[in-house]
C-alpha cells in the first residue's frame, strides 16, 4: 500500500510540475508572439513609408505612360 501511495504522489508531483512548465512556457511564448507582432507592425510601418516614397517616384512616370497611350 505504501508503494502505490508514493508512486501516486510522484505522479501527482510530475503532473503539477509539468503543468507549471507548460504554464511558464506558454507565458514566454505569448511574450515572444507579442514581440513578433510588435516587430512585424514596426516593419510594416517602415515598408509603408518606403512604399509611399517609391510611389511618388513611380506614379509620375506611370501617368506619363498612360497619357502617351491615349494620344
From Swiss-Prot:
GO BP annotation list: chemical synaptic transmission
InterPro entries xrefs: Prepro-melanin_conc_hormone
Single GO molecular function: type 1 melanin-concentrating hormone receptor binding
Subcellular location: Secreted
Signal peptide: 1-20
Gene Ontology CC entries for this record: extracellular region; synapse
Keywords assigned by UniProt, alphabetized: Secreted, Signal
Main subcellular localisation: secreted
Family: Belongs to the melanin-concentrating hormone family.
Stated name of the protein: Pro-MCH
Gene behind this protein: PMCH
